Curated annotation (Swiss-Prot):
Residues 358-392 form a coiled coil. Gene3D superfamilies: 1.10.287.1490, Carboxypeptidase-like, regulatory domain. Its main location: secreted. It is found in: Secreted, Cell wall, S-layer; Cell membrane. This is S-layer protein B. It is a single-pass membrane protein. The mushroom-shaped unit cells of the Sulfolobales' S-layers may consist of three SlaB subunits and six SlaA subunits. Keywords: Cell membrane, Cell wall, Coiled coil, Membrane, S-layer, Secreted, Signal, Transmembrane, Transmembrane helix. Residues 1-24 form the signal peptide.
Length: 511
């Protein structure tokens, strides 16, 4: 093994000499370590540990190899350089794990207390020749992950890349791909053990893709991850959540192992929770999509259907029941349009509705206060009435007590009068009976008289007829008498008849 290593080193040296001579360079110094862009783990912030390997076929044997280091934020050495060794007989120097203490460095004239991650420049000098090598000092507790996102073989810019800890699902970092479809993320890393990450990428209009990445212990170079996604023609994008007039923007929060986008929202018990959703196909608003949510409440499967509100937007409303709070709902929202289907998840945290409860209690308190005020008025009115009635009762009692004897005398007097009236009534009743008997006798007598008069009237009527006959005979005999004489006779007869009738009527009335 050592033999092969020596051959490899010798070959590298000869290649370096060949390149140096062929280029006609003025220096033959070749630096093998550190190499440009090398990542160096900062295990101890108090010292910077490097591997130094150089070769210079022109420099004399035993030439001193010096190292000068500068870093970010104007970090530099306090001296012109540090000798790390001498070239051996093969014109080489190889030093492993050479430690540069922090006491050799300053920043802006002040000695630093610890190294910080960043880009450092290592300048190696041998016999008047030097080479500057850029390196990256990284924290051993961090690892850089380079995520390249492609769609149809073309880099996809604007994709959101997220890295999660597989063990606990914690979101570690999020970044967006650049124009080359690349996102650089530096995440926590435990260099003493194997680390597992879940890398996801998503962009509106594209499928969410993810990949689990395993990084072994003591790994210091960047980890490259390639993700390939496909366009989605039909997409549902929640715009905002609304509950009790409060609007909450909808922000995606992808969870490891879930291909659907996940959104987190909160609402209050006993209210109507709404999700405003954009439905697009190839970026254009869609009307006629069917969007519904399914969820479990107290073990019962429930569902709600969204209504179209215009411009490709839909309102999905859910009535949150009164239950033991707080409680959580997982809303699985699925939309279909033609042959396309899209699904996302909303995790809803339902909290107690203290506002409505306070309003309800305030309303009840107001009603009770109003009723109490009304009762106070009624009680005051009753008290006044009772006081007045008590006064009247007292006055009436005094009046009655003072007039009992008077009323007793009046009652006795009334009883005497009633007895007198009863006696008088008895007398009047007896007299009335007597009068009635007398009147009955008189009526009977008058009736007899009327009958007699009727007979007389009949007789008189007969006589009148006879008289009329006589008069007619006389009229024939006495034609020379004037009309006036005849009229007087007729009037006399009529007056006699009227007198007789009047007498009859008087008797009937008396009867």
């Amino acid at each position: 093994m050592v033999k092969y290593m020596n051959l490899i080193v010798l070959g590298m040296l000869m290649f370096g000499v060949f390149v140096t001579l062929s280029l006609g360079s003025s220096t033959a110094l070749t630096v093998y370590s550190p190499f440009p862009g090398e990542h160096v783990a900062l295990i101890n912030p108090k010292e910077l540990i490097l591997n130094i390997s150089v070769y210079d076929p022109i420099a004399p044997v035993n030439s001193t190899v010096g190292v000068t280091i500068s870093g970010p934020y104007d970090i530099k050495m306090t001296s012109a350089g540090v000798p790390v060794g001498e070239l051996n007989s093969s014109h080489m120097l190889t030093v492993t794990d050479y430690a540069f203490p922090v006491t050799l460095f300053e920043a802006n004239g002040t000695q630093i207390s610890a190294f910080i991650p960043g880009q450092y420049n290592v300048t190696i000098s041998v016999a008047g020749c030097s080479e500057t090598i850029p390196i990256y000092v990284i924290s051993p507790n961090e690892i850089e992950i380079l995520v390249c996102v492609y769609s149809n073989g073309v880099p996809l810019p604007g994709a959101t890349v997220s890295i999660y800890n597989v063990t606990n699902g914690e979101l570690l970092l999020t970044n967006t791909t650049n124009s080359q479809g690349l996102a650089e993320l530096t995440v926590p890393y435990v260099y003493t053990m194997t680390n597992e990450y879940n890398v996801t990428a998503v962009k509106p209009g594209y499928q969410l893709v993810y990949k689990e990445v395993t990084v072994p212990a003591d790994h210091i170079t960047p980890v490259t991850v390639k993700l390939t996604t496909k366009p989605i023609t039909f997409v549902l994008t929640p715009v905002y959540f609304q509950d009790m007039g409060v609007i909450e923007p909808a922000e995606p929060a992808q969870l490891p192992g879930t291909p659907e986008p996940v959104y987190v929202a909160s609402a209050y018990m006993g209210t109507t929770f709404s999700i405003i959703i954009n439905a697009t196909e190839s970026g254009m608003p869609v009307q006629g999509a069917t969007i519904s949510a399914s969820y479990l409440i107290s073990g019962k499967q429930m569902s709600s259907t969204a209504t179209y509100i215009g411009n490709g937007q839909y309102n999905l409303s859910i009535v949150l029941p009164n239950s033991t709070v707080p409680y959580d709902l997982e809303l699985v929202i699925t939309g279909t349009y033609q042959t396309n289907t899209y699904t996302f998840i909303t995790l809803l945290s339902v909290q107690p509705n203290f506002y409505c409860e306070i309003q309800r209690l305030q309303s009840e308190v107001s009603v009770l206060e109003s009723e109490v005020d009304q009762l106070k008025v009624e009680i005051q009115s009753l008290n006044e009435t009772l006081t007045l009635q008590a006064s009247e009762i007292a006055s009436l009692k005094t009046y009655l007590e003072g007039n009992v004897s008077y009323f007793s005398m009046q009652i006795s007097s009334l009883e005497s009068e009633i007895k007198y009236l009863n006696s008088t009534l008895m007398t009047l009743s007896s007299e009335l009976t007597t009068v009635n008997s007398t009147l009955t006798s008189e009526v009977n007598s008058l009736t007899s008289e009327v009958n007699s008069l009727s007979t007389q009237v009949s007789t008189l009527s007969t006589e009148v007829n006879n008289l009329n006959t006589t008069i007619n005979n006389d009229n024939q005999k006495i034609s020379s008498l004037t009309t006036l004489v005849y009229g007087g006779i007729i009037l006399g007869v009529i007056a006699l008849i009227i007198a007789i009738v009047a007498v009859v009527l008087v008797f009937r009335k008396v009867a």
